[in-house]
Amino acid sequence: MRQILIAVGLALAVSILLTPVLIRLFTRQGFGHEIREDGPPTHHKKRGTPSMGGVAILAGIWVSYLGTHLVGLALDGEGPSASGLLVLGLATALGIVGFIDDLIKIRRARNLGLNKTAKTVGILAAALLFGVLALQFGNADGLTPGSPELSYVREIATVTLAPMIFVLFCVVLVSAWSNAVNFTDGLDGLAAGAMAMVCAAYVLITFWQYRNACATSPGLGCYNVRDPLDLALVAAAAAGACIGFLWWNAAPAKIFMGDTGSLALGGIIAGLSVTSRTEILAVVLGALFVAEVTSVVVQILAFRTTGRRVFRMAPFHHHFELVGWAETTVIIRFWLLTAIACGLGVALFYGEWLTAVGA
């Protein structure tokens, strides 16, 4: 628990202190955000706001993760794990794709960065590598970071995926989550605040898995997760970094995370869900992100098949703006819905454990 608190504190400190430095630097360099022309009229005043703030989030996560482990090693703790490094590696790779996308948008002074093919290839490459490596690095108990068995809050023994299918499943998860967070990042602080809550929920889940790991506490309800404590540190670092960034990203935002941050944070959710064996539960925890990306898919399908739109604009947070909700109202209400979803997800996780132990 001490390491988790250190991870949150370090990430928050780095993020909240580095972000204003980036604001000044990016402002001097003219790294301003471009606004989509067909977006809500109230958003045009945001044109020129510095972007690529995801650099501060990733920096906060990495400094926190490595710093916490240095402290842990001094206190006879363990070093970084395969699971933790895989999740952070995935997030960083996606963050690099997002950074290139953001940079191209800025250079071209328009809201169009990497073309769809290049961006998709970058995301798929990161996802494929993650999926392949997730089934490597078996520990003394034979546990690998990922499991070919589909998972709800633990592995579903009746649904086992072939290695190749598992890798493809990881590709779908990574692509879906990275795009989901990316679509959600359209209002000041919305994605950062929601991510902080989802990551906080994952801290509780992975720490509980650590306290009830089959390797140390065999018995009813134990969890076969390779590195649960290290995953808790990753989740704690991500939560702290998002909170620190939110200080500057809250409405009216002084900086945006850009694709650098949104793609990386989508990778955090995808990576944590695979390595903690909670791929299905993650849909509940990240219900806001799921709803946002679903609204885009529904809008596209409806328009292509009927020629009509379901929402005034997608993602659907813009729909609520266009029907008269103030931006801050949308943000706060969506945060509340995220808090409810996270609470429900944690309750489902704990309820399954109670059932497993026969309580």
Curated annotation (Swiss-Prot):
Keywords: Cell cycle, Cell division, Cell membrane, Cell shape, Cell wall biogenesis/degradation, Magnesium, Membrane, Metal-binding, Peptidoglycan synthesis, Transferase, Transmembrane, Transmembrane helix. Its main location: membrane. It holds the Pfam family Glycos_transf_4. PROSITE patterns: MRAY_1 (PS01347), MRAY_2 (PS01348). Its EC number is 2.7.8.13. GO terms for cellular component: plasma membrane. It comes from Mycobacterium sp. (strain KMS). It catalyses: UDP-N-acetyl-alpha-D-muramoyl-L-alanyl-gamma-D-glutamyl-meso-2,6-diaminopimeloyl-D-alanyl-D-alanine + di-trans,octa-cis-undecaprenyl phosphate = di-trans,octa-cis-undecaprenyl diphospho-N-acetyl-alpha-D-muramoyl-L-alanyl-D-glutamyl-meso-2,6-diaminopimeloyl-D-alanyl-D-alanine + UMP. It is an enzyme of class 2 (transferase). Its cofactor is Mg(2+). It is found in: Cell membrane. HAMAP family: MraY (MF_00038). GO terms for molecular function: metal ion binding; phospho-N-acetylmuramoyl-pentapeptide-transferase activity; UDP-N-acetylmuramoyl-L-alanyl-D-glutamyl-meso-2,6-diaminopimelyl-D-alanyl-D-alanine:undecaprenyl-phosphate transferase activity. PANTHER family: PHOSPHO-N-ACETYLMURAMOYL-PENTAPEPTIDE-TRANSFERASE, PHOSPHO-N-ACETYLMURAMOYL-PENTAPEPTIDE-TRANSFERASE HOMOLOG. One of its GO terms (biological process) is cell division. Belongs to the glycosyltransferase 4 family. MraY subfamily. Pathway: Cell wall biogenesis; peptidoglycan biosynthesis. Catalyzes the initial step of the lipid cycle reactions in the biosynthesis of the cell wall peptidoglycan: transfers peptidoglycan precursor phospho-MurNAc-pentapeptide from UDP-MurNAc-pentapeptide onto the lipid carrier undecaprenyl phosphate, yielding undecaprenyl-pyrophosphoryl-MurNAc-pentapeptide, known as lipid I. This is Phospho-N-acetylmuramoyl-pentapeptide-transferase. The chain crosses the membrane at residues 3-23, 55-75, 84-104, 120-140, 156-176, 187-207, 231-251, 255-275, 280-300, 334-354. It comes from the Bacteria. It is a multi-pass membrane protein.
